[in-house]
A protein has these predicted regions:
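A short alpha-helical cap/connector motif
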Residues: 1-172, 177-198, 202-258
């Protein structure tokens, strides 16, 4: 598909070797990494086989997407399961997705919403989202998902202008990395205090920890990770699941000001 300027998500870089232990610095130097679990292929296979509850429809969509050139843009099944659980835990009714691709993550979120829940999906690709629509119809969720084909920043700006501020419970950001900061700021206006903003690719296949990687996408993710770490407006955690999932919970503005 032809490139579009800062509108649709990009494929992740190839997996890079782990940064050498000798590069460890700061807080990491004080941690006994031998106590951390290494997720090798055997253990990951166990995780998928024994703990992932993936609906058959989602498994078929994942298999179809895997045959596509941009398959690496799809989230992993255990991440999809986590996102569905998070949506239920915060009792979300209205959700946002920035970057839809073939609709796998949207399915995970929409299936977790109540019957009267709504998911607004932002993407620019008719080709990719036509696959998504097909699976959404089969799942009986087409009326629960509002797909808006336009640059995500424009769609979010229109929602804000229309008075949807704090009108959403959950947002998932997985689109063009150079605009991640903009999407984050827009979602902070749209997601209610106590809601959740989930940001994909926060570890970017290890590139964020490699000083030799200074491309625009890596720099943007690095900068946003650091910004959110220091952002008093949210509670946050970066989870090493999938390609790194950063969770930010907007705080009540009154509590932040006090």
């Amino acid at each position: 598909m032809p490139k579009t300027p800062a509108r649709s998500r990009r494929a992740s870089p190839r997996r890079r070797p782990a940064v050498a232990a000798s590069r460890a610095a700061g807080k990491a130097a004080a941690i006994d990494t031998s106590r951390l679990l290494a997720l090798d292929d055997r253990l990951y296979g166990y995780l998928l086989d024994e703990t992932v509850r993936e609906p058959q429809l989602m498994a078929r969509l994942r298999a179809e997407t895997r045959r596509m050139p941009n398959a690496s843009m799809q989230i992993s099944p255990e991440q999809a399961q986590l996102m569905g659980l998070l949506v239920k835990l915060i009792e979300a009714r209205r959700a946002l997705e920035i970057g839809t691709f073939t609709g796998y993550s949207a399915l995970a979120v929409a299936l977790a919403l109540p019957a009267d829940g709504r998911l607004v999906c932002c993407d620019v690709s008719e080709q990719w989202t036509e696959i998504a629509r097909r699976y959404w119809r089969e799942a009986g969720l087409a009326d629960r998902i509002d797909l808006r084909l336009a640059p995500a920043a424009d769609t979010l700006a229109k929602l804000i202008a229309a008075g949807a501020t704090r009108g959403f419970d959950f947002a998932f950001i997985d689109a063009d990395k150079e605009n991640y900061d903009l999407y984050y700021e827009q979602c902070l206006k749209l997601v209610r205090p106590g809601g959740l903003i989930a940001i994909d690719n926060a570890l970017w296949h290890g590139a964020v920890a490699d000083p030799a990687c200074n491309d625009a996408d890596t720099a943007a993710i690095r900068a946003l990770n650091r910004k959110i770490r220091d952002d008093a407006r949210v509670d946050m955690v970066l989870m090493p699941i999938g390609d790194g999932l950063l969770l930010a919970r907007p705080r009540d503005p009154a509590a932040v000001a006090s």
